[in-house]
Amino acid sequence: MERILKTAFAREAAAGGMVLLKNDNGVLPLAKDAKVALFGRPSYYVFRMGSGSGDMLAQPPRQIYQGLEDAGISVHSALKEHSLKWHTENIGRLDIINRNWFEWTNIMPEIPLDEALVDQAAAESDVAILTIGRCCGEDNDLRLEKGSFYLSDEEEALVKLVNAKFKKTVLLLNVGSMIDLSIFDTYSFDAILYTALAGETSGDAIADLLTGRITPSAKMAATWAKKYEDYPTTKEFGGAITHYSEGIYVGYRYFDTFNVEPRYAFGYGLSYTSFDIAITDIRLDGTVVDVSATVKNTGNYAGREVVQCYLSAPDGKLEKAYQDLVAYIKTDLIAPGESEDVVLSFDLTDHASFLEDNASYILEPGKYIVRVGNSSRNTHVAGAITLAEEVTTVKACTRLAVNMFHREISKKDATPYTYAGEAEEIAAATELALDPADIELTVFAPTETNPPKLLTVADEDKNTTYTLDDVRAGRATVEQVVAQMDSFELASFVNGAIYEGAEKNATVGSMAKKVHGAAGETWSSEKYAIPANACADGPSGIRLSVFGSPVETDTDMAHLMVAFPSGTILANSWDLDAARKLGACVKDDMDILGIEGWLAPGLNIQRNPLNGRNFEYYSEDPLISGRCAAYVTYGVQCDDDGEQTGFYTTIKHLAANNSDCNRGYCDSIISERALREIYLKGFQIAVEEAQPHALMTSYNMINGMYCSTNYDLLTGILRGEWGFDGMVMTDWNCAGAPSLFQYAGNDLVMPGNSKQPILRALETGAIDRASVQKSVCRILELVLKTNFVKK
């Protein structure tokens, strides 16, 4: 695929995920002959991505002023020239700041402006466009201070100045996640576009929306509160011990259940056109619910709508949120006056609640209200499913119970969100009875009863050395190859390969030998004909770079890669086809480079807006997170015919990595119910729908146990319940006892600095040899899915 085609897709996908939050007085789209004045440093030096491993070193991004000028919009020249001159003279280390792990930044100093220049721009322009930007990322959470979560003094002054001087104003939010917007309650702007971090085509995609070449169609995949204190997570974020006291009430589940009015609701987003969603039918087939609707474009622009389906479950033994997202679909482009029929489907058993008392998923008796609309705060009742008795859908094992005092909030005294006519809609709704006999019970046996078996060399094979070529030819099994390996070879294979000379300065990007700038690679062996697998960071493309101080020169190949939109943009698009296409484009870049594994996508829940890596992740909702990850995985691992491509994704970070500062030593205290229904659910969806070939664990602990060495998480749930059949790897330089990695089900220690501890443990018997052999088998099975498939 030619690069121009990938950048064209990146531009389209970026525009599809930018949310129009406000559009008063018909300011947008801009007139074809509009004259605009651009304010804010990101208007001239846009943040295309966040910092850390999620950053990209591709071509310089298209700037906002460039995109507008190429679209035929007149950008005030004197203001532009002043801004570009000052920016160039004061760029300092901004051009390499995200390459040095100790120089992360959230904000760029603003451009000083003479009031006379602003007056001139106001007299000669029709519209003022102000861009507010924020950069955050790995090891770089936002902070509750000015210039981070809050606007800086310079930004506040600029807001007031633009508001006072211009009659028509547009605000662009070039941010990875929510920042405080309370100043705009007083100093109002006519239009607000949440551009997020959109990759290298940022300026062109923004111009496409501002000029109306593309009609906005994105919706919020996370709730934005009016103030930070409105989130239930504000008192428990980023500490050494973090109690997830909100339980299942995350994001809109909290705001709706406790009736806290958000600034921008989950699922909200405006368009230049308008739509009518008419519910036409609801059906029940076994446990599957189908809701049919007709979407009509009632406005004057061609556009796309996102139809969302929510479920309100009855309370019983367990409290339930006011509603949960259970299905969604994005229409095709609908012309004015035209319609499209859609069907939203979901299986009611997928939304059973976890009862910790007996480690079971249950559907409780009562009425399940089905709602359809275009945001969480704009739905109508489509019907109801009734269940006469409690039914257990899954019998599991207690795996991740809290082992200390832990209290969660309750909705007992809360009054939930409602809307005019809701009670009447529920009373008049079509009711469909679910027969308990139609609900199948799934029982998971304890995985502890089936431990790995020690592999030994058969007598007839003692004079034969089997290789991976023999496995490929059908002359041997992977197990026969691994059975031959001595302790050193086993310890080598379960560690990433750090080439000679890099051990003492093993920075990200310096450890791979196969592809310079890659994040790491697996061990290779001529003896067993086993090639190395190289992996590179994501999730917005392939990042090839070396972190350090001083910053090293980029590799030539790094700039050939496309910087695609961030995970948040992809989620805001609610477009699964775009997710699949993004995966296919990334796969093409992997092929160019010789990279087999992509360390992406990331699908941790956006629990709190301060998390620096929110831009990498998809949503506060596990359904959106899981489905986005699944479709990206489809695009990477499968071609259009469903055949394996020889490339793979590594979904990450399992699990509850919801703060990036102090991430290696924090303990997330979470009820097993909240874990299973919120923080693990997206991973479960991605695994069950797409079977990614690899998965990465997170740095943090859950309930006192590091995720990287947690048997219950990696073997009991991931493999025992979800059926994951791929390889698990650690994050780079994680904590956790080396003797526990493979026993827990963590196969590959990255970047590879635990070889000696594991070798000693093998030789002393402190580690189960059969578990290490099993991990090597999984690694070789991954190699068979990649290198040999490509050949």
Features from the language model and the residues they span:
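Short beta-strand elements
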Residues: 378-395
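Glycoside hydrolase catalytic-domain context in secreted enzymes
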Residues: 1-354, 360-372, 376-378, 398-791
